[in-house]
């Protein structure tokens, strides 16, 4: 997992809380990143119909999805987030050893199951839930 998921959630909560359009610069300042990174991540949210962009004086990004029902799983899927993944595989599928040739497949299945459990958990949490947590913390 990379920081894109965190950035997307942060931006969506900002947009929900503001109730208006915000520029990539305004979002970047609140997120503490650069506007180019914000635009890159929000492109996936725009494609998924969660935000829209507008040009002009009142331009920027505007939340179009209902934050009450927008789950963190939907956000993760919109930006292709995998929570548990491993790019490196031990062993060699061409070797004549059950452990050496089979470990990568077993571990990939394990990672997929862990990723699905994370996604199932995130299905229960919405953008409004995150916003509420932020404003009820002591």
Regions found by a protein language model. Name each.
Residues 36:
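Key DNA-contact positions within bacterial/archaeal DNA-binding proteins
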Residues 21-23, 52-54, 128:
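Short, structured loop/turn "capping" segments at alpha-beta junctions
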Residues 1-33, 62:
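N-terminal helix-turn-helix DNA-binding core of bacterial DNA-binding proteins
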Residues 64-138:
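Non-DNA-binding regulatory cores of transcription-related proteins
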Residues 41-46:
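Basic amphipathic alpha-helical segments that dock to polyanions
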Residues 48-64:
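Beta-hairpin "wing" of winged helix-turn-helix
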Residues 4-7, 55, 114:
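Generic hydrophobic secondary-structure packing signal
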